[in-house]
Amino acid sequence: MNSKGLTLTIIFKAQSLNYGEGIGNISELKKLARGNGNVYTFASRQALRYDIARIGNKLYNWNLEVVDKEKGTIQFKDELNIKDSQEMDLFGYMKTSKKSAENEDGGSETRSAAVRLSHALSLEEYKSDMDFLTNKGLADRIDEFPNLANVEQHLSYYTYTVTVELA
């Protein structure tokens, strides 16, 4: 079989794209370290996929009412398919089923993604820039102490790749 596809590599300028769990009052960017010790920030492919679906819904009315927790885990609804959801069509899915009287084996129904994304990786090294935040202006109004936060910042060019299976 001779598969056809389209690959796009995109470079864009952005700041502080994707935060992880954080520690205390510090919001940490998602980062990875290379073998040479350099640290780079990234936006996960899941974050990119989420935003594509969000923008698809906002601009093109994509149906995002396609998930439930009927079987104990959050997944795409059993009765829906790619005709009902652009997201399911482009990014694929796995619907699991438990063993039951009707379904002795249990198992899963899957569709491979037609669109695949890489992480968006910064092209410039992260240098531990922090932004110190406070709500002092609000706290002063009621004679209270301000709340403090530290937010990691990184302005950089980023790159990611999109691969689309055409047939």
Residue ranges of each PLM-predicted region?
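RNA-binding basic/glycine-rich loop and surface signature characteristic of RAMP-family CRISPR effectors
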Residues: 1-167
